[in-house]
């Protein structure tokens, strides 16, 4: 028998690229228009400070746990270690759900970008768009199935390529910036004075899209088992966050100094493409368009890797049946990749009948991943409290509390209704979790406590279905 070669390890640069690439997808290119629809520049800046601080607390929590618990693999492992296997399943299944729903958003906005070059794709939700998106989805699945580490190496190159249009846009934004235009309605009223109630409402309205663009910051943690050094995953999370925050603030705020808020809010999506076209002429639209396409393909590549890796790790830890962890000669989780791609395909075909596919998919994506983030913060609190006498753990306890409070506020602002819809997708997952328990010698399909939580999830799912049927949630 031939001895298997050990899997190649991913270095720090590739891990940082994974964090940046998995977060910079479609969101940053439409960020200005989405924010201008919700807020003036003053509240936007305050919201960035709040979201940046909250995400930093999450990143520091991840970094601390990676250092303190180096044997754990994957973001859901913290929930399992701190609160039991069912919590680990809830976290892992939610992360997997978030990842492939994110791929659906990439498909819809990619078709919009292609529509700038080829009018047949402009509607984003016609049959040609869905067919092309389907081919891309299965092609990326095939590529990742050829080897996860190989995909990560190419991801480093893709990240460099897609940052160039963003940096060029930021440079022109600085050069063409008009201070008087930026400050004339800084707080979104005629006197441009600070009015607390109005400002707080604007901050709340733009929090959702800001949290969406940070989805993926934990990417290095998910592949920490394959890092050359365990510490690299934590460093990549922090460095990736700092880079992302700088890019997002500049890309979203500078256009307020070039066009009025009303003009920005009414501009077509992808907003950055059309803003840059106004700045420099027709070539600007093509330049940003190519960058957007590369950006989405890079993020889509990352999020093809991550959900499959999640299923693989969950199967290894007996949270899913063993067949979810089957790998090929390249060490890629083939079964998990095919299952995930199949679900994406089903969702893509539903785009023929939905009206707000992009918003619906990214709202579900954000709501489901916030659950994972909450459990990370909760375990950070539990671990720090249990080791309170060790150096630095009082500060880590505070970091965990702040991260948890931020995520709770996030789920409330993201919309509890979308979380209830996510519960629908948990029901088949709970079946697989129960089968894994039985396969590993447990007498009962679920424990009493797990049945109680399952009942709550089912009730929540029924409420979610009612919200859709009654028209309170538009899909």
Curated annotation (Swiss-Prot):
One of its GO terms (biological process) is L-arginine transmembrane transport. It is found in: Cell membrane. The keyword DNA-binding does not apply. It catalyses: L-ornithine(in) + L-arginine(out) = L-ornithine(out) + L-arginine(in). InterPro entries: AA/rel_permease1 (IPR002293), Amino_acid_antiprt (IPR004754), APC_superfamily (IPR050367), Arg/Orn_antiprt_ArcD (IPR022461). Keywords: Amino-acid transport, Antiport, Cell membrane, Membrane, Transmembrane, Transmembrane helix, Transport. It holds the Pfam family AA_permease_2. Catalyzes electroneutral exchange between L-arginine and L-ornithine. This is Arginine/ornithine antiporter.
């Amino acid at each position: 028998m031939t001895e298997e070669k050990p899997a190649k390890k991913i270095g720090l640069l590739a891990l940082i690229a994974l964090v940046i690439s998995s977060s910079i997808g479609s969101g940053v290119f439409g960020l200005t228009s989405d924010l201008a629809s919700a807020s003036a520049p003053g509240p936007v800046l305050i919201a960035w400070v709040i979201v940046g601080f909250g995400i930093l607390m999450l990143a520091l929590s991840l970094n601390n746990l990676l250092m303190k618990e180096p044997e754990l693999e994957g973001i859901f492992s913290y929930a399992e270690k701190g609160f039991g296997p069912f919590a680990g399943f809830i976290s892992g299944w939610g992360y997997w759900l978030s990842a492939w729903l994110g791929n659906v958003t990439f498909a819809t906005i990619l078709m919009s970008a292609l529509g700038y070059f080829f009018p047949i794709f402009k509607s984003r939700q016609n049959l040609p768009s869905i067919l092309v998106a389907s081919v891309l989805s299965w092609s990326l699945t095939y590529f990742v199935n050829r080897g996860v580490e190989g995909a990560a190496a190419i991801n480093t190159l893709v990240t460099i390529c897609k940052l160039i249009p963003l940096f060029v846009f930021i440079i022109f934004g600085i050069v063409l910036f008009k201070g008087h235009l930026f400050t004339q309605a800084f707080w979104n009223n005629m006197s441009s004075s600070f009015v607390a109630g109005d400002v707080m409402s604007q901050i709340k309205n733009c929090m959702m899209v800001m949290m969406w663009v940070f989805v993926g910051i934990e990417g290095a943690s998910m592949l920490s088992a394959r890092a050359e050094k365990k510490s690299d995953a934590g460093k990549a999370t922090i460095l990736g966050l700092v880079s992302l925050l700088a890019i997002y603030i500049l890309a979203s705020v500078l256009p307020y100094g070039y066009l009025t808020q009303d003009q920005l809010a009414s501009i077509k999506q992808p907003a950055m493409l059309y803003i840059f076209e106004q700045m420099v002429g027709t070539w600007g639209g093509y330049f940003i368009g190519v960058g957007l396409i590369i950006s989405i393909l890079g993020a889509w590549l990352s999020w093809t890797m991550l959900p499959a890796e999640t299923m693989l790790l969950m199967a290894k830890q007996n949270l899913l049946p063993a067949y979810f962890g089957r790998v090929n000669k390249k060490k890629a989780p083939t079964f998990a990749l095919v299952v995930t791609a199949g679900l994406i395909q089903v969702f893509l075909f539903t785009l023929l009948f939905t009206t707000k596919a992009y918003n619906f998919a990214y709202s579900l994506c954000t709501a489901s991943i916030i659950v994972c983030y909450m459990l990370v913060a909760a375990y950070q609190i539990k671990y720090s409290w249990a080791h309170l006498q060790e150096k630095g753990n009082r500060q880590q306890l505070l970091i965990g509390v702040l991260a948890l409070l931020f995520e709770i506020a996030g789920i409330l602002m993201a919309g509890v209704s979308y979380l209830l819809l996510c519960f629908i997708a948990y029901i088949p997952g709970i079946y697989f979790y129960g089968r894994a328990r039985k396969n590993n010698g447990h007498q009962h399909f679920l424990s009493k406590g797990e049945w109680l939580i399952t009942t709550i999830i089912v009730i929540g799912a029924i409420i979610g279905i009612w919200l859709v049927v009654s028209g309170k949630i538009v899909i």
